Structure formats: C-alpha cells, structure tokens
Amino acid sequence: MSLLEAVILGLVQGITEFLPISSSAHLILVQALFGMTFAGFSFEILLHLASVLAVILYYRHDLIEIIRGFFAYFTKRTPQNKAMFWFAIYLVVATGITGVAGILFEDYISETFKAPIFIALALAVTGLFLIIIERFVRHGNRTEKEMTIWDSIIVGLGQCLALIPGLSRSGTTLIVGMFAGLTKETAVRFSFLLSIPVILGSSVLAIDDLISGDLLASTGLFELAASFVVTFIASWLGIVFFLNLVRKSKLVYFAVYCFIVAILVFIFQDALGHADI
C-alpha cells in the first residue's frame, strides 16, 4: 500500500464514519473503483480506532459526566446521578445486542450483501428514511432522563442493521432513536457514545495482528501513521459537520447524497461487480 492510498483510505474512513452515509460502503466502493486494497482486516480496524479516538476526545466531558454519575449513584442517588447511571446501562444493553448479532451474523451478512446492487439499495433506503424522519415524523421530546430500557433495545436492534454494507451505523441509530421518540440531540449523542464500545469491541478481533507486527510489516510505519492521523482529523471534522447540520435540520442533504451514490453504484454495478470487494 502506497502513502497516497493510505491517506485516501484514511480520509474516506474519517469523513464517512460518523455521517449517515455508510463508511463501509464508501470504503468498498473506493477500493473497487480505484483498485485499492486494505492491508488486511487489521488495517481497517486501525482506522476505526482513529475514528473512535476522535469521538472519545470530542465527548470527553460527557464521558466523564456519565462515569462519575454512574459510580456516584451508588452512594448519592440524585436525579442527575440516576440519569447518568441508567444512560450507561442503556449503552451497555445496546452494545450487547449489537455484539451478539455481530458474532452470529456478521460474516454471513457481509458476504451475502456485499454485491453492489445491495449497497445501492441500502443507500437508497437510508436516504428515504432520512427524509421521512426529517420531514414527516414529529420529533420526539424525550431526553436521556426520560429514556427507557426499550429505547436502548430498539437502538441496539437498529444498529444491527448496519452490519449490512450501505446501511450507516450512525444513520440507523439516529433514525430508530428519533422514531422511538427521543429528541434529535439525545439520539445523536447516544449514537456517538454508542460507537465507542462497539468499535473498541470489534477491535479485539484484530488485536493479534496489531500486537504481532504483521500489519506494520505489510504496510509500513509511515503509511500507518499517516492514515491514522488523517482518519482522526477527518473524523473530528466529520463529527463537527454532522452535528452542525443536525442542529439546523439538514438531514435531507445526506438523503440526497445517498440517492446520488446509490444511482452511481447502480449504473456502474457491472464494473464494481468484477472488482474484488
């Protein structure tokens, strides 16, 4: 893998990871269109770790508040501590549901639905639901203090759908969270914080390669460092950009983008179908 390829893949991963446009679909498409290949599954995981580091630093104050409230609730049961305690529990529940689904079905789903036509359909469905949730569904008014265990179960199940290439993890969790009656801000916050344990959990699968040095030997230290830094910066900017558009009720922009990409994938599906994706 060249330095340019490492930077491009890092840029694509970072920009698309937290936008409701499916990072996995874009990585597959970029590799197929330009003849690029990942240096193994562990390289993809390394890029995800750079993205999750951006989330951790961006939401560091929220994480500290949740952790403090969780443990403080055992000795001081204030309404705020209670809210943070249960918010942490909801994150664990949603993560557990996704983890079980990933272990049982990820290999089958990723292999079955990796064809370009499925990616196009998934992107189109994402765009459709983004329009529905933005224009035709009354936005909820429940914050994290009014969340229930059922919200975490629903969001966790929604996140399982993101195992399908073309369905965005951030998009599905945001959509189902808002359908469940959460405020847009609460749904987005829960979605971003939920990405931390999910991505860290999936990283365990590649820990042997990361520790053994196989990835370093096959890719190169400079290329790995460059892709990691680029992914981190792009992820941070992606978070800021997404939150800004969410506050301005501009999810329809992402819907239009999903439709455009879906059409392009459909048009060029024969060329993509012959690529090793």
From Swiss-Prot:
Membrane topology of this protein: Multi-pass membrane protein
Keywords, in A-Z order: Antibiotic resistance, Cell membrane, Cell shape, Cell wall biogenesis/degradation, Hydrolase, Membrane, Peptidoglycan synthesis, Transmembrane, Transmembrane helix
Localization per record: Cell membrane
Top-level taxon of the source organism: Bacteria
A Pfam family assignment: BacA
Gene Ontology MF term list: undecaprenyl-diphosphatase activity
Any GO BP: regulation of cell shape
GO cellular component: plasma membrane
Main localisation: membrane
InterPro entries (UniProt xref): UppP (IPR003824)
Transmembrane regions listed in the UniProt entry: 1-21, 39-58, 85-105, 113-133, 147-167, 191-211, 226-246, 251-271
Keyword presence, Membrane: yes
EC number(s) per entry: 3.6.1.27
Known role: Catalyzes the dephosphorylation of undecaprenyl diphosphate (UPP). Confers resistance to bacitracin.
Family that this chain belongs to: Belongs to the UppP family.
Annotated HAMAP family: Undec_diphosphatase
Protein name: Undecaprenyl-diphosphatase 1
Organism whose genome encodes this protein: Shouchella clausii (strain KSM-K16)
